[in-house]
């Protein structure tokens, strides 16, 4: 389907991951509704259901085309200029492919692949088709911009622009354009068919799914803890929350056996404590950091099997890796202060502190049950790891 965003015609073609060929009339999927994934706090797994109001694949692709050729044109130019700094002036792609990648809880992201000469530029266009998605998008765009200032460059996607496009029946479809991390994939706890044990599988859509080694798994948990702790503001207690491995908030790439991690979402970035006009005192900030750390040791171990199955609890290797990543991200003085506080707690006291944290931050009843079932061994393992860190920092 050719359109004219600039001087010449540019062909835009549509695809859906998992389906062969291009999607256009009279393809049987063209007029079928988009599925959605919703999470019910009472349920053990996500549920798939049709959208209300109904948005078809045709509605979706037409809205994306309207964005790319209308309100999104300056956003595309900004992205192309960032990706091709050697090119000057306006850059017109030779062609585009729009690939509907997945049906998420909040967004239906499309990968927008543009050919510019010999270069191929991939971007992501996150599209919200529900009220929950729209509300999440407004919060996330603000969060990503603030979090990016605290993280190493390239750790989170750059947002190039946002617009609301009218779909069928004048339904408003908000969407924003951002970086696509090429070669990175979702990962989840999964049962390895070779030995029947639990491992971590990478959904490599370019080749084939594969399982990580234990060393690579530990590196994943270390980097997750490092990025979330770097994003945490100890002065204000601002942090990324909620986040969840089951939602695919982090993605990874393995090169020469080394793991590279990216954070691709930040649904909310807000403080957990509110101080008076003078702000929080040092004791309050230290206690807030303690709560953040202990919650991180729990949440970093939670996933769903294959992303959508039963709640899953990681192997103990995640504990030492989480502790390592956390302390690597902290300034030395703050790390020393927290180690002093943690050193005052015994094994039983650690369980007493973790219990209300698990109750407060558990997102779903099934996850709370999972945490409480594993709380005693988790606390014991965490205590042993902390003793090693405190006495041999």
Model-identified regions with their sequence ranges:
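Helical subdomain adjoining the active site within ATP-dependent kinase catalytic cores
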Residues: 5-33, 302-393
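ATP-binding glycine-rich phosphate-binding loop
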Residues: 8-14, 18-119
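N-terminal low-complexity, intrinsically disordered segments
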Residues: 85-101, 135, 139-182
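ATP-binding glycine-rich loop module of kinase domains
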Residues: 97-99, 103-149, 209-213
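The N-lobe alphaC helix and its flanking beta3-alphaC-beta4 segment of protein kinase-like domains
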Residues: 133-150, 376-392
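Conserved structural core of kinase catalytic domains
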Residues: 158-219
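Conserved kinase catalytic-core segment
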Residues: 208-243
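Catalytic activation segment of kinase domains across protein kinase-like and atypical kinase folds
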Residues: 239-309
């Amino acid at each position: 389907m050719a359109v004219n965003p600039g001087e010449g015609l540019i062909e835009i073609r549509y695809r859906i991951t998992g389906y062969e060929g291009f999607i256009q009339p009279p393809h049987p999927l063209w007029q079928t509704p988009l599925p959605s994934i919703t999470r019910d706090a009472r349920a053990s797994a996500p549920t798939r259901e049709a959208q209300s109001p109904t948005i078809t694949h045709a509605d979706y692709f037409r809205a994306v085309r309207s964005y790319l050729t209308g309100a999104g044109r300056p956003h595309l130019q900004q992205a192309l200029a960032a990706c091709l700094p050697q090119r000057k002036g306006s850059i017109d792609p030779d062609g585009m492919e729009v690939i509907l990648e997945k049906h998420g809880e909040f967004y239906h992201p499309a990968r927008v692949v543009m050919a510019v000469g010999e270069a191929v530029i991939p971007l992501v266009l996150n599209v919200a088709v529900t009220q929950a998605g729209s509300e999440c998008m407004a919060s996330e765009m603000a969060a990503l911009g603030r979090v990016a200032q605290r993280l190493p460059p390239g750790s989170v996607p750059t947002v190039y622009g946002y617009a609301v496009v009218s779909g069928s029946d004048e339904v408003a479809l908000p969407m924003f354009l951002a970086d696509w991390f090429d070669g990175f994939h979702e990962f989840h706890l999964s049962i390895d068919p070779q030995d029947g044990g639990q491992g971590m599988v990478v959904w490599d859509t370019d080749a084939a799914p594969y399982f990580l080694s234990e060393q690579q798994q530990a590196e994943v948990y270390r980097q997750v803890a490092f990025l979330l702790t770097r994003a945490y503001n100890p002065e204000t207690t601002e942090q990324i929350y909620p986040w969840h491995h089951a939602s695919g908030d982090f993605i990874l790439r393995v090169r020469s056996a080394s793991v590279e991690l990216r954070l691709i979402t930040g649904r909310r970035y807000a403080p957990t404590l509110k101080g008076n006009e003078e702000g929080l005192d040092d004791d309050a900030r230290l206690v807030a950091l303690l709560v953040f750390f202990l919650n991180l040791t729990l949440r970093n171990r939670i996933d769903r099997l294959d992303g959508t199955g039963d709640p899953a609890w990681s192997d103990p290797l995640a504990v030492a890796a989480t502790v390592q990543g956390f302390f690597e991200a902290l300034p030395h003085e703050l790390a020393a202060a927290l180690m002093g506080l943690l050193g005052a707690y015994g094994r039983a006291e650690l369980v007493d502190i973790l219990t209300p944290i698990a109750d407060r931050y558990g997102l779903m009843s099934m996850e709370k049950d999972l945490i409480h079932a594993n709380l005693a061994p988790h606390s014991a393992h965490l205590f042993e790891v902390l003793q090693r860190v405190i006495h041999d920092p």
